Regions:
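Bacterial N-terminal signal peptides
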Residues: 6-17
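Active-site gating/metal-coordination segments in enzymes
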Residues: 22, 27, 39-42, 93-211
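H/E-rich (His + Asp/Glu) clusters that bind or coordinate divalent metals
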Residues: 35, 62-63, 70, 223-231, ...
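Active-site environment of divalent metal-dependent phosphoester hydrolases
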Residues: 59-62, 88-91, 115-116, 147-151, ...
């Protein structure tokens, strides 16, 4: 088989994950371009400033893995990680205990308890459980999650049919304000996931994996879900909200900017959307510099050193046309945003410190 650009070194580098394949047999899922541009590439081993990761989860399976995570955090300059558990009850209590050896390095957030939501009085029970979790150590609530059918990111009981702007949610959101518990919420998915999975979709492989089925009865679409978030933010001005993943408005950051302009109680994390924003560096940089006071760093991609360093590479450098196939399923080249020092300080930890100290 003949490949015009397929040196032995490239073949060896991708052994086991990809291979040189003739174009007549090439499948998009096997497309692993290697940049041919001889441009500077910067290695960023640790963040330029201390970081609070505002979007992480309960990845470790043992105390030893928690210890290993701490070591990685030390080596990459992650000062603290927010563990979004979705959880209440016994599960939440067990996670508080799991991370209690490193109280200054982890904040453990709870979920909402939707048990008995089809019965009268469930909200009072949910508020009581929220208060209990707070007393147990919960610093915030999240990650709530609604991809169209309701608040399904909850353990042990999902909130089918309940959207964040449902009147039944208001007592919970008001209690969050009273207890100074910020609310982290994922609404919708990015626009690619609502498009046809065909040759016109430029995020095809990733969008096909996460495609939203709008034929399901009662499901809300992207704009309806963002509207539900806006309603909740507007109707609960004393509650602090963090919209996960740029509110899934990566293809139209202006929509998020309009919300920032209207609602001072709204923030957004940048977790797990590096591959969506890095292909448009000038547009993204201008947005992030303008709204530097409203964005917080997040990962949502595990605990590896390489993962953290990829995020720093994108945020801190001006490097051009590189790929990270191990972490991102798109086929777009990535570009560094080269954010200013002031913006990095705010996104890495300044805004997060303000949110969790309010």
């Amino acid at each position: 088989m003949y490949c015009r650009i397929c040196p032995l070194a490239v073949m060896l580098a991708f052994a086991g994950t990809a291979f040189c394949q003739d174009i007549t047999d090439l499948k998009l899922k096997n497309f692993r371009p290697v940049s041919i541009y001889n441009t500077p590439q910067t290695s960023v081993d640790k963040a330029k400033y201390p970081v609070i990761d505002f979007h992480s989860h309960d990845y470790p399976k043992s105390d030893a893995e928690v210890d290993a995570w701490i070591k990685t955090m030390d080596e990459t300059n992650i000062a603290k990680s927010i563990i979004l558990t979705y959880s209440t009850g016994v599960r939440f209590d067990s996670l508080v205990a799991k991370y209690s050896r490193y109280k200054n390095r982890f904040d453990v957030w709870c979920g909402f308890d939707y048990t008995g939501q089809d019965k009268q009085g469930w909200v009072a029970h949910a508020v009581a459980e929220l208060e209990r979790c707070h007393a147990k150590g919960a610093k915030g609530v999240g990650e709530l999650g609604d991809k169209g059918l309701g608040e399904l990111y909850s353990k042990p009981t999902p909130g089918y049919g309940l959207h964040i702007d449902d009147p039944q949610m208001k007592p919970l959101l008001e209690k969050c304000a009273e207890l100074h518990m910020p609310v982290s919420i994922h609404v919708a998915e990015d626009a690619w996931m609502y498009l046809n999975a065909d040759s016109t979709n430029d995020g095809l492989m990733n969008s096909a994996t996460w495609k939203v089925d709008l034929t399901k009865p009662g499901i809300l679409n992207h704009d309806q879900l963002v509207a539900s978030l806006e309603n909740a933010v507007k109707n609960n001005p004393k509650t602090t909200f963090i919209a996960c993943h740029f509110a899934n408005c990566c293809s139209n950051l202006g929509a998020l900017g309009r919300l920032f302009d209207k609602y001072p109680n709204l923030y957004a994390d940048i977790a797990a959307r590096y591959a969506e924003i890095a292909p448009v560096p000038r547009y993204t940089k201008a947005f992030m510099e303008k709204y530097a006071d409203r964005l917080v760093y997040g990962t949502d991609m595990g605990t590896s050193e390489k993962m953290y360093r990829i995020t720093f590479h994108i945020l801190e450098t001006a490097d051009e046309h590189f790929y990270e196939h191990d972490y991102f399923s798109y086929h777009w080249p990535l570009y560094g945003l080269n954010l200013s020092a002031g913006t990095l300080k705010k996104i890495y930890s300044g805004n997060a410190s303000h949110i969790i100290s309010e």
